[in-house]
Amino acid sequence: MMLMTLVDEIKNRSSHVDAAIDELLPVTRPEELYKASRYLVDAGGKRLRPAVLILAAEAVGSNLRSVLPAAVAVELVHNFTLIHDDIMDRDDIRRGMPAVHVKWGEAGAILAGDTLYSKAFEILSKVENEPVRVLKCMDVLSKTCTEICEGQWLDMDFETRKKVTESEYLEMVEKKTSVLYAAAAKIGALLGGASDEVAEALSEYGRLIGIGFQMYDDVLDMTAPEEVLGKVRGSDLMEGKYTLIVINAFEKGVKLDIFGKGEATLEETEAAVRTLTECGSLDYVKNLAISYIEEGKEKLDVLRDCPEKTLLLQIADYMISREY
């Protein structure tokens, strides 16, 4: 029998997550609030974080059904951050569709995000497991949400700065993006019955691949076709976002005319991408992303050889080989 591809494996688990979302987050009164809350969740997304959680649990001997509420909780937290990020970043398009605040207004979007946030903890509390392990997971997720807020604050602060260093960027990315991957892996391990040592190693796996994921995301923003991205190519540059690519280029004395300009022609964008390629900044970030991914994969040495471990390794590789 032919082995399913990584995409098939993730889709298989995602279908269970989607069914659990329907059960645990039904559209009830007031309907518009729950429609707004479910809007991005139902729009799809990769479901990578729930997949990491489920695979971590399975890799240490548990099963999908026992951790489904936790997987849903992590996905709801992810979507809560997207809704609020789009408001703060003034991004009107998400996943190729109008953002939540465009359809329901900023106040409605804030409430939709808050609903997902609170429901995540309510749903996580429903996990049937040892109370001490559920409590540990609640602690992990609550601290993660705080760190995400810290990371978003740092990202916003960068917009007012003339200079941002690589270490500052890495702190921001770790808090804003990678901590939720770390939480997903750790929660899955804890609910699967893993020791604290194994759970911490899986947390490190999530943290490291999450950093690599964001670095590669920054690369894709400048290199992927717009129809794949679902947004304007080079939008980070035009918006004046301090990605590591830009930080590295500025440290080399490179000038980027479209940085913070707000808009640019296709020719201007292509010229900027050529400049970043020729100065080596794009390759620098690509290679650094690869090194984070490889280090993250090494953390899985604590696991026995099993299909789920292989899939976690493949997810790590996917972070730096995807098209969007």
Swiss-Prot record:
Binding site for an all-trans-polyprenyl diphosphate: R94, K176, T177, Q214, K231, K241
Top EC group: transferase
Any one GO molecular function term: metal ion binding
InterPro entries: Isoprenoid_synthase_dom_sf, Polyprenyl_synt, Polyprenyl_synt_CS
Keywords tagged on the record: Lipid biosynthesis, Lipid metabolism, Magnesium, Metal-binding, Transferase
Cofactors, names only: Mg(2+)
Binding site for Mg(2+) 1: D85, D89
Summary of the function given for this chain in its UniProt record: Catalyzes the sequential condensation of isopentenyl pyrophosphate with the allylic pyrophosphates to yield geranylgeranyl diphosphate (GGPP) which is a precursor of the ether-linked lipids.
Protein name: Geranylgeranyl diphosphate synthase
